[in-house]
């Protein structure tokens, strides 16, 4: 029987970063392109002084578009990292494929039996970990636990 362990902030941030990985990739990519666009704009305006105004206008437009994209991805990442509707976040580790797990709250109360359908490595170079959300009622619902199939036990 596994006991639920409360996640510390560092683990929680790592997991949420994993969860919104796609937004993070785009955010990093576009935020790194902005200085490159600024440098290219300045170099191009220096090399072709006759077209400097047009080059500056294009550079400003592209940079503004990139800033808007970076801001929108950042906003989406922050919205994913906000506190979930389920008040408690716990981790069960290690978890193996097809392992039947009985969950126990930190207060010692037994929860439903759960069967691990899939197992994924959330943290690189660490053991398998399963993140679950447990509401105050103590019931684990499938919509909150993507990797668990509830078994009434």
Residue ranges and their predicted role:
Residues 1-28:
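Cytosolic juxtamembrane N-terminal segments of multi-pass membrane proteins
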Residues 19-82:
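Alpha-helical transmembrane spans
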């Amino acid at each position: 029987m596994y006991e639920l362990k409360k996640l510390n902030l560092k683990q929680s941030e790592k997991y949420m970063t994993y969860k919104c990985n796609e937004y993070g990739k785009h955010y990093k990519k576009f935020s790194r392109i902005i200085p490159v666009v600024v440098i290219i704009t300045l170099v191009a305006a220096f090399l072709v002084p006759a077209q400097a105004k047009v080059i500056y206008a294009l550079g400003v437009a592209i940079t503004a578009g990139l800033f808007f994209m970076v801001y929108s991805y950042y906003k989406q990442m922050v919205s994913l990292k906000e506190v979930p509707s389920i008040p408690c976040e716990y981790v069960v580790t290690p978890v193996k494929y097809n392992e039947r797990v009985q969950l126990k709250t930190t207060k010692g109360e037994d929860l439903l039996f759960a069967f691990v359908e899939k197992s994924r490595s959330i943290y690189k170079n660490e053991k398998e970990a399963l993140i679950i959300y447990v509401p105050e009622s103590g019931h684990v619902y499938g919509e909150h636990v993507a990797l668990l199939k509830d078994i009434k036990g």
